[in-house]
Regions:
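Glycine-centered coil/turn sites that cap beta-strands in beta-rich domains
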Residues: 381-424, 433-437, 445-451
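Conserved glycine-rich acetyl-CoA-binding loop
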Residues: 454
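Short linear sequence motifs
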Residues: 4, 72, 117-120, 355-358, ...
Length: 454
C-alpha cells in the first residue's frame, strides 16, 4: 500500500517498456504506466530509500536504466549504466546510517559489475565492483557471519558465487566455483541456527549448493537438470527445521530438508513441465499449515498443501505462460488472500475464497519487498535516530543494528492502552516477550539485549 488508502496495489514491469501500477479493482493508478523504453524483467524493490517517510519503487530495465519512482508514479531519480539490468535490485542499509542503499547487478556482453548506490545516484564507496562475469539475476544481501557488516552475494554465468564485503573487497574463501552457470539468485538463511547465514544457490547442471559463510560447502542436492526461478525457505512440517523449496527443468517441485538430507514425505510433486518461478508459501485456508504456490512455464498454476496434496480448485490453467513468481496478498481487505500472477498474456488475479491465515512465510519473490533474498530478522538502524511524534500508532525501526550490545524500539501510543512487545525468529517461534503492560499515551522506549525467554 504505497498511496495510503489501506488497500494493496500491484506493481510490475513488462516487455513493452512500461512499468504498471494497478489498484485492487484492476484500475490503473494515477501516474502509471511509467515508460522506460526497454524491457523490464526485474521485480521491483520497495522501500524508503530517500528517508522522506514514503516508500519508493526501484527496478531495472534492459537499457541499463535503474529507475526510482515516487509512490505517485513520478520520477525520483535515474541511474544509467552500460549493459542490462535483468535481476531484481536489493535494498539494504549497507553503512548503518538508517538509509537504504540500492544493490544491483549487470550484464554487459560477457562481463558484469555489482553496483551499490545511494538514492541520489552517488556510488557507494568502492563500488561498482567489476566481477568480469555477467549476471542475469540480482544480489542477495545480509550479514553472513554476524560481524555487524553487510555482505553481498551474487551468482554469475561464469559458474561462480561471489561474496563482496561492504568495502568492495571479495570475502575470504570466495569465489566458490561450481560446474555450470547460475540462472537463480542466491538465498540467505540460517539453516543450522548457529547465528550465521548459509548461502543457497542452484545452477544449470541441477546442483543446489549450500555454502557456509566462509565458502565451504555444507550440503549438496542434485536434481539432474537446471534449477530456475529461485529458492524459498519454509518450515512446512513444523518440526523446527527449515526446508528449501525449488523447481526447474526436471519438472518437479522439491521440498528438501538439508539438515536431515531428505525431501519431506509427499515431495517432490510433479508440475508437468519446466518451471521458471520461485515457490511461495502462505496459509491460504487458516488451518495453521502452509500451502505452496508454484507455476510451470505453460501457464498451469499449482497450489499444494504442506504434505504435497493438491489444494482445492487447483491446478488452474491460465492464459499465457508463466515466467515470473506469483505474489499473495489480501488486496481487497476482505479477509481472504488473492494470488496475483504475471503471464505472457497479461496479469491474472485469483480470489481464494477461504479465511486467510497469518503465519509468517515467504509470500513473494526474494522473500521480502526489499528483495534481499534473505530470511531472518533485519532491523533498520540509525544511531542518531529521533522518533517523531506521529498522529497514529507508530513503531520505530530498531537502533542500533547490529545491537551493541542491545537495540531499542520506540512505540508511540495516541491513547492509553496495553503494550505487548514480542520478538519472533524466522520460523515464527516466540523468542522473547520484552514488555507486556498497560501504558499511558505518548512515546515508550523498549530495549532488547538479544536474550530469549530462558
Amino acid at each position: 500500500d504505497l498511496n495510503g488508502d489501506l488497500f494493496s496495489e500491484i506493481y510490475f514491469g513488462a516487455d513493452d517498456g512500461n512499468f504498471y501500477g494497478f489498484d485492487a479493482e484492476g484500475t490503473s493508478l494515477n501516474g502509471f504506466p511509467f515508460n522506460v523504453g526497454a524491457d523490464v524483467r526485474s521485480s521491483p524493490a520497495v522501500g524508503d530509500v530517500d528517508g522522506d517517510g514514503d516508500n519508493e519503487i526501484v527496478f531495472g530495465s534492459s537499457n541499463g536504466r535503474l529507475s526510482i519512482l515516487n509512490n505517485d508514479g513520478s520520477e525520483n531519480s535515474i541511474y544509467q549504466i552500460s549493459g542490462l539490468i535483468n535481476g531484481s535490485p536489493a535494498l539494504y542499509d549497507l553503512d548503518g546510517d538508517g538509509d537504504l542503499e540500492i544493490v544491483f547487478t549487470s550484464d554487459y556482453n560477457s562481463s558484469g559489475k555489482v553496483y551499490a548506490i545511494h538514492h541520489n545516484g552517488e556510488d557507494f564507496e568502492n563500488f561498482p565492483v567489476d566481477i568480469g562475469e555477467k549476471m542475469l539475476v540480482g544480489a542477495a544481501v545480509n550479514d553472513l557471519d554476524a560481524d555487524g557488516l553487510a555482505d553481498i552475494v551474487v551468482c554469475t554465468w561464469g559458474e561462480k558465487i561471489h561474496v563482496i564485503n561492504v568495502d568492495g573487497s571479495i570475502k575470504q574463501g570466495f569465489p566458490f566455483i561450481s560446474n555450470k552457470r547460475f540462472n537463480t539468485p542466491a538465498t540467505l538463511v540460517d539453516l543450522d541456527l548457529d547465528g550465521k547465514m548459509e548461502i543457497v544457490a542452484g545452477n544449470d547442471n541441477g546442483l543446489l549448493h549450500v555454502l557456509k559463510y566462509d565458502g565451504t560447502e555444507m550440503f549438496l542436492f542434485d536434481t539432474g537438470d537446471d534449477i530456475r526461478g529461485g529458492i524459498s525457505v519454509s518450515d512446512l512440517n513444523d518440526d523446527g527445521s527449515l526446508e528449501l523449496l525449488f523447481s526447474g527443468y526436471d519438472d518437479l517441485l522439491h521440498a528438501w530438508n538439508p539438515i536431515d538430507g531428505v525431501e519431506l514425505a509427499g515431495w517432490p510433486v510433479d508440475l508437468g513441465d519446466n518451471s521458471l518461478t520461485e515457490p511461495i508459501t502462505v496459509d491460504l485456508d487458516n488451518d495453521g499449515d502452509l500451502e505452496v504456490i508454484a507455476a510451470n512455464k505453460n501457464g498451469i498454476l499449482y497450489v499444494f498443501h504442506h504434505d504435497g496434496t493438491p489444494f482445492s480448485a487447483f491446478p488452474m490453467s491460465l492464459a499465457g505462460g508463466v515466467e515470473s513468481t506469483p505474489v499473495v496478498s489480501d488486496l481487497d481487505r476482505d479477509g481472504d488472500y488473492e494470488i496475483a500472477v504475471g503471464t505472457t498474456m497479461g496479469l491474472v488475479v485469483i480470489d481464494v475464497k477461504k479465511d486467510m491465515g497469518d503465519r509468517i512465510s515467504w509470500k513473494l519473490h526474494r522473500g521480502n519487498m526489499e528483495r534481499t533474498g534473505s530470511m531472518g530478522i533485519v532491523l533498520l538502524s540509525n544511531d542518531n535516530y529521533e522518533p517523531p511524534t506521529p498522529k497514529e500508532f507508530y513503531v520505530s525501526p530498531g537502533y542500533p543494528n547490529p545491537f551493541n550490545p542491545s537495540t531499542s524500539i520506540n512505540i508511540y501510543l495516541i491513547e492509553s492502552n496495553n503494550i505487548k512487545v514480542s520478538i519472533y525468529d524466522a520460523l515464527g517461534r516466540l523468542v522473547n516477550t520484552i514488555k507486556n503492560k498497560n501504558a499511558m499515551s505518548g512515546n515508550h522506549t523498549f530495549n532488547w539485549t538479544g536474550s530469549d525467554n530462558n
